[in-house]
């Protein structure tokens, strides 16, 4: 398991190549970047004291949310749910065999599952009929 998402791509440098070479799958955790890639938050957002993001550095949070706005404007297809896009983005890397998103509602579970429709048939984890 490694932290991997559109905002944190460090595993692409050494971890993923090593896993591919050894034929090991990668479980990408925190694929929505603690909710920043959900599309729900804009720069200037604040979080409740009981929210783990409340303890994040305010300047880093602002920078992350500004980057999310750039990603939404330039990378996410119009009309596509940002969270689904972020999960599919992780799954499109050949090293990633599974993402581990969190969810707080049945709707989020459905949205998380819907991301699979954006992963191509040629992905090594794509469902194959026998």
Feature map (PLM): residue ranges:
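Beta/alpha (TIM)-barrel catalytic core signal, keyed to glycine-rich beta->alpha loops juxtaposed to Asp/Glu
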Residues: 1-129
């Amino acid at each position: 398991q490694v932290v991997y998402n559109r905002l944190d791509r460090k595993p692409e440098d050494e971890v993923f190549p090593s896993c591919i070479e050894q034929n090991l799958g990668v479980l990408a955790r925190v694929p929505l970047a603690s909710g920043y890639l959900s599309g729900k938050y804009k720069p200037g957002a604040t979080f409740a004291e009981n929210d783990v993001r409340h303890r994040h550095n305010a300047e880093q949070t602002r920078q992350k949310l500004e980057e999310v706005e750039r990603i939404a404007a330039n990378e996410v297809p119009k009309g596509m749910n940002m969270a689904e896009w972020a999960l599919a983005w992780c799954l499109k890397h050949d090293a990633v065999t599974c993402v581990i998103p969190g969810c707080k509602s049945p709707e989020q579970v459905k949205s998380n599952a819907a991301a699979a429709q954006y992963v191509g048939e040629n992905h090594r984890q794509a469902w194959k009929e026998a």
